[in-house]
Amino acid sequence: MNIIFYHPFFEAKQWLSGLQSRLPTANIRQWRRGDTQPADYALVWQPPQEMLASRVELKGVFALGAGVDAILDQERRHPGTLPAGVPLVRLEDTGMSLQMQEYVVATVLRYFRRMDEYQLQQQQKLWQPLEPHQHDKFTIGILGAGVLGKSVAHKLAEFGFTVRCWSRTPKQIDGVTSFAGQEKLPAFIQGTQLLINLLPHTPQTAGILNQSLFSQLNANAYIINIARGAHLLERDLLAAMNAGQVAAATLDVFAEEPLPSMHPFWSHPRVTITPHIAAVTLPEVAMDQVVANIQAMEAGREPVGLVDVVRGY
């Protein structure tokens, strides 16, 4: 079995040695430009166009993250980048659910207890108690009800919040109100005080966080974007905050990363920025999942995390 690995950020040595210890009979190598030697499986993140284009012999391509938008965007721009008929598999969790829960709970409670406002008051040396938010008037809406969306919804419900989710197709989540389909999006948005985006990035979801959506939220709503920067129209968010429609936003992902130093988000008092760290891939857990999927495919079984390339997730 031949496996090729490419990731522009991960430490290749850690992955190569970890995979080799789990698959001792496999030939595993780091892919470099000009490498056209045979491969059965490719483990990639943001692969160069030429890496996969001619590899019709591949049994599977593994995206080393929860999202596959980078690969599918490249396929849309350069058809044939992803060999036709080759299964595309994404990581399902690899420790991301817990990390995402931690990030979201910390951020939600910061807004719910108005810590962001007290921090601004501290800078002004202002001692002024604020009216506390009430659970029954602080409905949380989650765009996306996949593995991460469900995990976050369950955790927030444990804190006594009213939680609702919106997704492309209906989902059943205990203790959470579910909305599905484009026609139900307005009903989902109306009454939402804090909106969390956990949607997959597809052509249909790009730009979904826009002025039209913001205008339907409760006044002084909060935004948390931890999915993809392409979901957010940044100018629309700035306008909504400056108009008072959106009270504050926590953003982990951006249209351009790293965020340019002159971007207005950096200096906006109501924007909290984190450098795409809400949930990161944990190598050891990810390797276990990839290897288990390779073994399943070798045995003729369907892997966990198989992507529908038409839907985009």
Swiss-Prot record:
Main location as per UniProt: cytoplasm
GO molecular function, one term: hydroxypyruvate reductase (NADH) activity
Statement: the UniProt record of this protein carries the keyword Transmembrane: no
Location of the protein in the cell: Cytoplasm
EC number: 1.1.1.79, 1.1.1.81
Catalytic activity from the UniProt record: glycolate + NADP(+) = glyoxylate + NADPH + H(+); (R)-glycerate + NAD(+) = 3-hydroxypyruvate + NADH + H(+); (R)-glycerate + NADP(+) = 3-hydroxypyruvate + NADPH + H(+)
Descriptive protein name: Glyoxylate/hydroxypyruvate reductase A
Species for this entry: Yersinia enterocolitica serotype O:8 / biotype 1B (strain NCTC 13174 / 8081)
Name of the gene this protein is made from: ghrA
